[in-house]
Design a protein with these regions (language model features):
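C-terminal motif of bacterial Sec signal peptides marking the signal peptidase cleavage site
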Residues: 2-5
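Ser/Thr-rich, low-complexity intrinsically disordered terminal regions
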Residues: 7-137
Length: 137
C-alpha cells in the first residue's frame, strides 16, 4: 500500500469540512503564550471550562494532542487554536494561535485571567452576560 500524501488529503478533507487546524498550527510562531501554575490536565480542563463559559464553539479537542481548536463563537467562525505544553509536573504553557490578531487577543484576554486566578469563572460569566445585555460584543 502506498500512503504518500495521505496527511495532505486528510488535511484537505478537514479544510473542506471547515475544521482544519493547519492554519492554527502554522500561526503558532506568532501565538500569545503564557505559562500557568497547573499540571497539564488541570490546565486543559480549566481552559475548556472557560471556553464553554464564553460560548466559544469547540470544533476539535484532543487531550492526547495537547490542543483545542475553536471558533470565537457560533456566529464568529474565526478559528483559534489553544496548544498546551507540559513544562513540568506543576506548570503548563498555553499558546493561543489564530490567523486573526483580534481573535487570539480576545480568547487569551478571557482565558488567561481565569487561569491566572485574577478573576473567577463566575466573574467572567457575569462580564460576558453584562456585555450581551448592553449589546456590546
Amino acid at each position: 500500500l502506498n500512503f504518500v500524501g495521505c496527511a495532505t488529503l486528510w488535511e484537505g478533507a478537514k479544510g473542506f469540512a471547515g475544521v482544519s487546524t493547519r492554519a492554527l498550527e502554522d500561526n503558532r510562531k506568532t501565538a500569545i503564550t503564557k505559562t500557568f501554575n497547573y499540571d497539564y490536565f488541570a490546565c486543559y480542563t480549566k481552559t475548556m471550562d472557560v471556553l464553554k463559559s464564553m460560548q466559544a464553539y469547540i470544533y476539535t479537542q484532543s487531550i492526547k494532542k495537547h490542543m483545542i481548536a475553536i471558533y470565537v463563537s457560533e456566529e464568529d467562525t474565526t478559528p483559534v487554536g489553544l496548544f498546551f505544553k507540559e513544562i513540568d509536573a506543576t506548570n503548563t504553557q498555553v499558546e493561543v494561535s489564530s490567523p486573526s490578531t483580534y481573535a487570539k487577543e480576545f480568547i487569551s484576554g478571557n482565558v488567561f485571567p481565569v487561569l491566572d486566578k485574577k478573576i473567577t469563572l463566575e466573574e467572567l460569566e457575569a462580564q460576558i452576560h453584562a456585555k450581551k445585555e448592553t449589546g456590546n460584543k
